[in-house]
């Protein structure tokens, strides 16, 4: 039943019944492997494609011979983050320039820009920010056939030939049996026109080629062209309408579109999919042959007439070089034409070419040519090497096109299969390496243009590779990709799980992928081929649902970009499950019958049940053990990492499991992390692979342990030093802090966890806290999923987290002179400067609140023209104090904390700074946030809620032994949500705490209800897991018993401190003059259309009037009102709202004559309310930016008006009113006349 299992440094009691046959792979291998491929092979491929670059005359050629990346980056990863630079190494390329006329060769090494490096953790540091490149799920290149039905129910077949890049070919049929082709999405032409253009010019040749097909005859009747030339011209007219067509230009266009490797690329995967789909062996298997089939090489009879062709025979027929087979279908003879490829290792020839390691099928005609011309084994092998691009062409071939047409015609007779484009056999992953390679290719293509131009312009004798090559386009392409591609994302670093999941994310969006609007239901849905590849649970809620997924725990990506899942092979002869692991792609898996991982086996690994429940494609079937081909490796293999961390997942509703998976990623790291009592056994693996913990590089003994450093003496006497990260800010503002968990003198093994990171506890992922919960209502504070918590959690800092904010101040050069960072700030008292050092920068350890100065900075003000007397006095008595204004960096509204770090960068010290910046100061302020009312918490089962009240410990309900509950949850949150996993977790948590166990209950293989009941009884609890509770206020028992136990609760990154916001005055929108909205803009609260209705319904006329005028966009009225409030006078009459003026202006712009008429038919001249604005109210002194000049920060408005002589007005205002708006991010101002914002 339960057995102890060692997990890292801990022992957990595991309920798993299934032994793990396969170790879980490295979870960020997707990223690392792909990038490694790019550096070693991807780059070489691109250089090989593009070289040589030849001049237009052909007498100069530039070749890229080799490349290398230097070993040492200029700065370490941490330094790059501090300095806002990119973690990169220089790339040097060896270039050879050949002058073919003189035979002169110049070779040199050219610098090709800095190339971003991937860190150990699978991320990139770009301009100091850690970013992740998300893998993209796209349609694989290949041939896809689908069927529709016309209005009479007739089956119409259409096909699409999709390359990696290049022109598409689309075939379609109409109800009259005519087959059309569209070339590159232009107007359609009969398919026979394309065949004629390819060289089959007469009707007889076409019918000979493809057989006497009804559809072909109907199409020939429709076809108006009668020769190759006419067909070429017809196609040219479609592709280039309006250009004068000639046969030559048509020929070269057709060649360029399909048969030029530079313009048309199938990629390795496209060639593989073509050969798989169009090969004879899959198409003729299990059909009857219409003629006897003879091996053309040996002359032996392979299949007699009328005999059924087996799978093995079909493969033999293809590999001996037969490309056309006639089969019988319902008495008709049908011609099946392959794409003329053979498996070179099985083709009957006297030479052994296995050493060449050619995996792809090769073009038969090229192979025959090689074999005819050479007779010596070595010569044959060399020739095969040299002509690899022809043997396995990257572009489409004539044979391919004919085979695709043949397949289309065969489908009418039911030969072949229709494709499902949502099947994972037809979708592939483009990971970092390939995305980067494509970007690099674009850069090199631009570089090629520049080089060709320069070759023609420059003097041939003076040319060197250096002055031919301009690296800017290459560098720009790479920079653009990392900086602004949709797939290059700012890493989600809230906690280690968020990091890990982000690197394993799979997105169907992005360039070359789908768009949210166009993606239909089918693409988003779970497909049976996702099994073991993409998690059916973890995907976002909202517009991206189903378009963004997550790789499952055991999935891996093969060389073609298809996702593979592992299976154990079953020995059919004995019915024994072996330990041999086979990785299969989705389309390979379709051919086999696969048993579940939890199918019971005896001690000899044989199936116990007489009927085994298995999967075959999308069906669930029961078969005898002898028919099973494979068995799942682990029950976890169908879900992602985050989902496999939910205990009792099998008892949760899928929608709630989805929320649970997503919310674990939002848990903030707590000060005292605590691993879950009820885990699933994957916590250790997740923490280690996320890269936040420190692992020992070698065996050894711990020599020294400090808070920020661990030293280990290895066996051979070397010292390994590990520097730890202390209180660093993550991308999301959470705290990254590592702490040692070993002591001096401890022996450590290689790969052992020696330091915990954020949200880890002895090497295990620890996202939350184990708290004592009771499912009971308490005075209505549980209404609508609200959570009642005990003050104990606040007092003990159980749910306290540290958040770090970063503030930057830059001293720039302005037109009036440089800004200066200084302690001498005008009009600021000494008490405001008490924590600044002599440079004017805050000291580390200072406690700051909103409005405090972090960095003192002054900016020069415009000098006024001096009179002659002043100039004279200036000359005699020396420089008067320079005119400067205070532009210090202050703590924004609502923020506070302790300064934990200050970094100063300046030009003088040789730091790299942006142009125009002389000095930069970066201040880090840390906040300790205790759990508070309004914070969001959640369990792991999608059970989320907001804290409604924090109750004193003595008022909380308590257990018979006096232990008070820590949290009360609403029992009504369970039944309708159907996430029963939380109840089982609570019961098991109660027992585990009593026994002092840590438990592992893996998904789909965990503790059962019986196990839990047995343990409850063993520990002396009631079998229903309920306990009598007592009211903390009165001490009286509650009427009913209550389910009590330990649940793992997370504090989520939706904290009330980040959402609280209040405004008195602040920025206004430019056109409507209404306050902006949102906390970031320091905006007001929107009083929308429906809210106005509510006031109208109650006849609250005065309230309504002031909301629509002085509280919103009556420009002069609001200033007068503010002044009236400050001076304690009565509020004046409202004026005319700005929106009304805008409306009038809009109507006038439509050339309408607008008149404003009062109740008693008096016309108000429109002039009047335009003069309103020139009121005598000193609006600027109140920093109510009336002209809506959002380009001027508030300080500047204030200063200008100050000079205009409003001193006395200002003195009357009380000191404690703060007019400083938070920030001036102006959103686009949409005019909505029905809604007024206040």
Swiss-Prot record:
GO biological process: DNA-templated transcription
Biased composition (Acidic residues): 1193-1238
Entries under Pfam families matching the protein: RNA_pol_Rpb2_1, RNA_pol_Rpb2_2, RNA_pol_Rpb2_3, RNA_pol_Rpb2_45, RNA_pol_Rpb2_6, RNA_pol_Rpb2_7
Oligomer and partners: The RNAP catalytic core consists of 2 alpha, 1 beta, 1 beta' and 1 omega subunit. When a sigma factor is associated with the core the holoenzyme is formed, which can initiate transcription.
Disulfide bond annotation, renumbered to this chain: none
Family named by the database record: Belongs to the RNA polymerase beta chain family.
InterPro entries: DNA-dir_RNA_pol_bsu_external_1 (IPR019462), DNA-dir_RNA_pol_su2 (IPR015712), DNA-dir_RNAP_su2_dom (IPR007120), DNA-dir_RNAP_su2_hyb_sf (IPR037033), RNA_pol_bsu_bac (IPR010243), RNA_pol_bsu_CS (IPR007121), RNA_pol_bsu_protrusion (IPR007644), RNA_pol_Rpb2_2 (IPR007642)
Documented EC number(s): 2.7.7.6
PROSITE patterns in the cross-refs: RNA_POL_BETA
Record keywords: DNA-directed RNA polymerase, Nucleotidyltransferase, Transcription, Transferase
Molecular function per GO: DNA binding; DNA-directed RNA polymerase activity; ribonucleoside binding
Origin superkingdom: Bacteria
Lineage of origin: Bacteria, Bacillati, Bacillota, Clostridia, Thermoanaerobacterales
Gene that encodes it: rpoB
Gene Ontology, cellular component aspect: DNA-directed RNA polymerase complex
Function: DNA-dependent RNA polymerase catalyzes the transcription of DNA into RNA using the four ribonucleoside triphosphates as substrates.
Species assigned in the record: Thermoanaerobacter pseudethanolicus (strain ATCC 33223 / 39E) (Clostridium thermohydrosulfuricum)
Protein name: DNA-directed RNA polymerase subunit beta
Region (Disordered), start-end ranges: 1187-1238
